[in-house]
Amino acid sequence: MASEFYIGVKIGATLLGSFGAALSGTRTTLNGLGRVADELRARHTRLGDAMARAVAHPMRNIAELRGQYDRLGRTIDQVQAKQAALATRLARGAALREQRQGLGADMLGTYATAAATAAPVIGAVRQAATFEAGLRDIAITGNLTRDEEFRIGETMRRAALATSQGHNSILEGVGTLVAAGMDAKEAGQKSNLLGRVATATNADMKDLAGMVYSFSETLGIKGDAALKEAFNRAAYGGKLGRFELKDMAKALPEMTAAFAAKGIKGQDALTQIIASLEVGREGAGSGDEAVTNLRNWLSHMNAKATIDAYKKAGVDYQKSMSNLVAGGYSSYEGSLQIAQKFIASRGDAFMKQWKAAGAKGDEEAQRKLMESFGLNEVFQDIQTINHLLAMRQGWDKYQQNKKDMGSAQALNTIDQDYVRRAELATVAWGRFQTQIADLGITVGRALLPSLTDLMNTVTPLIQRTAQFAAAHPGLIRGVVGFATAVIGMKVATLAAGWGLNFFVKSPLNMVSTALTTVGAKWTLFRALWAGGGSRLSTVFQIFGMGAGAAGKFAAVIGRAGSLFMGFGRGALVVGRALLPFGQGMLMTFIGPLRLLAQGGMLLARVLGGQLVNGLMLAGRAVLWLGRALMLNPIGIAITAIAVGAYLIYRYWTPIKQFFGGIWASIRTAFAGVLGWFGVGLPKTFTDFGSHLIDGLVNGIRNRFTAAKNTLIEFGSNVKAWFANTLGIKSPSRVFMGFGDNIAQGAAIGIGRSSAVAARAAAGMATQAAAAASLQRINAARGGSPAGASVAGSGITVHFSPTITVQGGSPDGVKDQVKQGLNLSLRDLERMLDDLLAKRERRAYRS
């Protein structure tokens, strides 16, 4: 009504969204409190204005407005209080976190500053100390003075910088030369050559130092120029075959010593060694095998046993050697020439069989060949013969290698290779590292004297302190304890501050913040609840869902609940429909067997009632479930399942097409694979399906035959029971008697009640006549004849047909409407006929 006035304060979707967002965290809760407070203040102001306007209308509900105004004011105060408390807790937590981070940063910063400051100094001192220690080892081994040691050290530092080799590498090379017996000052002068050859050949510095010593001291190759020529020959010779210099560097000192023992020295000895190893490597499996073969040959040549063996074989070894040496051959080459002539006397058949056995690795066959051809009398092992045969086959290559190693091109190999190596980034990086290391040595050398003096000064003090500590242990314990206490208190103070912050203050603040947050959320919840709104939507927003999404989701769940309620009602309707259906199905069996019919009717009633009750119970359960889903957020999972099932039903066509495409791909892939193996996939599955159907049909046929036999047996038993027990031989005659009884009973009943029906009809006619007379009297009192009234007035017919249409297809509904209209039309016609007949009777009587 117009006089009724009602104002409801509803905190709607905006406040709901703010409340939902506030649940995501403390910071968002604080922001949500601010927004809600602003909204509440605005609502409070509008409510006050509404109260002011309502004062002018006494009929309006001022008391209700006042109550809402007060409640909203209290809610605003609570929200503001919670907002202030939460802001304070957050500020406290931020301050504690900043304090903790500041303390940790100070400690880490102090440590990092100390480490960063000390790292280069410590590195420089360590580098200088390491170089000084290596240099001192060389000086001690070579009996050098301090000045000589310093000069050699400077020479090695310059060599390291010039050749891009590290200081430690140069120290190792020079130390190897000195340890081998070379003069320390001379070894220091060889540092530049060592570094340059190491960079050019990429060989190990220790192996190169051994080569320098063997060249200089063993072969007598003196001077830097001669040594450089020797390395040029060796480096160039290593490129003439498959045996590089860095691979043969370890074996060269041994080979040079063996050649020097045979009287072969100088550049020729080195040339013959390199050329022999290159040729021997062609017939050997590896470089080590080639070295072994040459070693055995050198130990065999010129031995007394070898000379005697040749003498027994009819060869004057010494005379032949003298002639060959006089002809320009070395003793090594002369021994090879003598042996080659001896092998050639055995023919080419020996060499073919020897090579065939060697290719198979059959040493036993080679030994038998030595015995059969008489070689075992001269040569004691297989390695000797292998070297001899390799040199015999590659003698021309051996001579050419010697010539090439002495050419002008070969004598510039080290410089050319060094220039090419120096262009590499790795060498440039090594040069950079060497420069840094040299700087460290320079800085460290400047600090080492002071540090050494300091340590020398402190050491006696430490000794006196040790003596004093031994004499006064109690005082030492006190001093150490005091110092430890001071440091410990400093550390403990920092640690306690950090620990108090982390383990006490921060957790307490977190707990207080959590409690404040919970209180703020509860205040928001009460404000939200007081403002109204959907309960289910409110619950969803409490768990962090947005206002719009929560409202939509609640509406979806409500519709789902309504759908379940509809399912429940449908189940009830189905239950009611199934009751007569069940009864009808059961009644179809009534007929020939009356006793069984009565039992069937009883069973139908029982089953029908239980079925209806069960369906009604299921319907109520579904109805309850729908209501629960509408009101309880726990039903989200069930609703999600139902929605998923509906979506599958709704979009079954694209889903079926998608999985049909996958199945087609799988079938195509398997058909291709099985087709490659010769297996027909469709035929295989067709055979499998035919076997399956055949088994199913056979099983059904067998079971159907058994069921048919059972029914026949059951019918025979029932017939026999009726015939024997009840004495019914002919059921048709029994039912004829039943029909006679029914007709006779109907006749008796009609005869008994005919008088009652006649009296009722007479009474009805009397009442109709009395009513007609009363109507004529009323018409006469009105001043007009009854007939005139009837004749002069029109006929007013109120016809309101009611048509009940069951659900179904459009054609079915149309047919039902037509049938209803036809029935209603016949009723209308009958009613009009009765009306006209009554009118004629009244007119006639008038």
UniProtKB/Swiss-Prot annotation:
Which parts of the chain are coiled coil?
Answer: 59-82
Name this protein carries in UniProt: Probable tape measure protein
Q: What job does the chain carry out? A: Serves as a base for tail tube protein polymerization and acts as a template for tail length determination.
> Which InterPro entries does the entry mention?
Phage_tape_meas
Signal peptide, first to last residue: none
Query: Which keywords label this protein?
Result: Coiled coil, Viral release from host cell, Viral tail assembly
One Pfam family in the UniProt entry: PhageMin_Tail
UniProt entry tagged with the keyword Coiled coil:
yes
**Family assignment from sequence similarity:** Belongs to the P2likevirus tape measure protein family.
Note the superkingdom of the native organism: Viruses
